[in-house]
Regions:
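Condensing-enzyme catalytic core mediating Claisen C-C bond formation in acyl metabolism
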Residues: 1-65
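A generic structural signal for alpha->beta connector loops
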Residues: 21, 91-92
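A general structural motif
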Residues: 60-63, 92, 140
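Short glycine-rich or small-residue beta-strand-to-loop segments that form or flank ligand, phosphate
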Residues: 66-69, 145
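Charged helix-capping and loop-helix junction motifs
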Residues: 80-83
Length: 162
């Protein structure tokens, strides 16, 4: 794991606004008992449930990109990948991350991933990861962001173009 530092700030408004850069379409939160305070379970149960909550009433095929929490730990990344496969099946959306460039920023990582997602929607530009070459087949409309925290917590947020 490569460590980094950073911060991001968002102004949220209820309802629709002409100034909005994106729209929060779904939010999920789940927690699970774990055996180590800084780990997730081998099947990433909390992440699976948080993604399912964020996608409630939405066809998973509508998700264009997922920004996984993916800290660069073998067990954690594998567990998150298994949870993604359970939610999306064999047709995973495009995957990307900013951690290969800035490292894992701990508490700021979810906000920085959200910022990256908003910029991708605004600019209609998918940010490639060197080891995961991919090209979007359609305009970017929906991006799912995953974040996990100490103690077995997981949050997923689906944002859409405004």
């Amino acid at each position: 794991m490569v460590l980094g530092e950073g911060a991001a700030v968002f102004a949220l408004e209820k309802g629709s606004s002409p100034r909005a850069l994106a729209t929060i379409r779904g939010i999920g939160y789940a927690s699970e008992p774990i055996t180590h305070p800084v780990a997730i379970s081998a099947d990433a149960e909390a992440l699976r449930r948080s993604m399912q909550q964020a996608l409630e009433g939405i066809d998973p095929k509508e998700v264009d990109v997922v920004i996984p929490h993916a800290t660069g730990t073998l067990k954690g990344d594998q567990a998150e990948y298994l949870a993604l496969a359970e939610v999306f099946g064999t047709e995973l959306p495009l995957l990307t991350t900013n951690k290969w460039k800035i490292g894992h920023t701990f508490a700021a990582s979810g906000a920085l991933a959200m910022e990256m997602a908003v910029l991708m929607l605004q600019q209609q530009h998918f940010l490639l990861v060197p080891y995961l070459p991919a090209t979007p087949e359609r305009p970017l409309r929906n991006i799912l962001i995953n974040a996990t925290g100490f103690g077995g917590n997981a949050v997923s947020v689906l944002i859409s173009e405004k």
